[in-house]
């Protein structure tokens, strides 16, 4: 496990360097060809140029110059300040020097000629660590569609139900006149006819005091015919004899009428 750790670290470092170099930028010193030369437009022209950019690990700066008159030396800060051209420096004389910035911090470059360095032909760049690649922000989610207002559908018209046929009032049967039953006369037992008392000759009896006489034959026939009410079925009483008939044989005439009435009753 311990032997694999250095390999893993080197692999991670290689990947990191590869990513850094893939995002590196190549800068031309002074933004023009043959800008590494003397005299400069101003003494601080290269310092002003470097302040316009932000350098990161993996970037490349290129020096273009005339290699017959100029050279490039990578020095420490002390030699940069005093323009010391002697020491352990990295010297370039090819006329098209490309320097890869491999570590963070301040990198110092001076001219191979001390006089030119003092007149401003020198450069210091600040190198920063490459920013960590952040995953791009997710694309904004599309706005949620607003819920469409439901279109109100017209209510379905219910078909009118056919009116239920109302039961037609059945014509009530008119009361038919019930046939009046003719009372069948039952024969009555023959009772001995008692002679009606003869009225007193001294005073004529009043209608309430005179005995009711048997009905006449015409009245008996009428009582047998159908009548409109039960009261009609009873035989009407015979008229009382007038006071004038009570004189001169009234008793015999009354007995005769009673006999005739009894005979008619038995016949019918």
Curated annotation (Swiss-Prot):
Signal peptide range in chain numbering: 1-24
Annotated GO CC locations: plasma membrane; side of membrane
Positions in coiled-coil regions: none
Keywords: Cell membrane, Disulfide bond, Glycoprotein, GPI-anchor, Lipoprotein, Membrane, Nodulation, Signal
Location within or outside the cell: Cell membrane
Lipid sites, type GPI-anchor amidated serine: 243
GO molecular function: electron transfer activity
Record protein name field: Early nodulin-20
């Amino acid at each position: 496990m311990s032997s694999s750790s250095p390999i893993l670290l080197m692999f991670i470092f290689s990947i990191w360097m590869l990513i850094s170099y893939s995002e590196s930028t190549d800068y031309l010193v002074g933004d023009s060809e043959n800008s590494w030369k003397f005299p400069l437009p101003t003494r601080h022209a290269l310092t002003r140029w470097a302040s316009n950019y932000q350098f990161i690990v993996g970037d490349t700066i290129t020096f273009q110059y005339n290699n017959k008159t100029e050279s490039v030396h990578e020095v420490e800060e002390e030699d940069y300040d005093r323009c010391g051209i002697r020491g352990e420096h990295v010297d370039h004389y090819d006329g098209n020097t490309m320097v890869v910035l491999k570590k963070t911090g301040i990198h110092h470059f001076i001219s191979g000629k001390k006089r030119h360095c003092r007149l401003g032909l020198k450069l210091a760049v600040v190198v920063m660590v490459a920013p960590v690649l952040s995953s791009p922000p997710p694309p904004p989610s599309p706005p949620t569609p607003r819920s469409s207002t439901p279109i109100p559908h017209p209510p379905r018209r219910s078909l009118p139900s056919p009116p239920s046929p109302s039961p037609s009032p059945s014509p009530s049967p008119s009361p038919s006149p019930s046939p009046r039953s003719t009372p069948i006369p039952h024969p009555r037992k023959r009772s001995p006819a008692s002679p009606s008392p003869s009225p007193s000759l001294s005073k004529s009896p009043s209608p309430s005091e005179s005995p009711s006489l048997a009905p006449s034959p015409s009245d008996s026939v009428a009582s047998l015919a159908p009548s409109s009410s039960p009261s009609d079925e009873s035989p009407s009483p015979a008229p009382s004899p007038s006071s004038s008939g009570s004189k001169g044989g009234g008793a015999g005439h009354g007995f005769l009428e009673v006999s005739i009435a009894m005979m008619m009753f038995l016949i019918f």
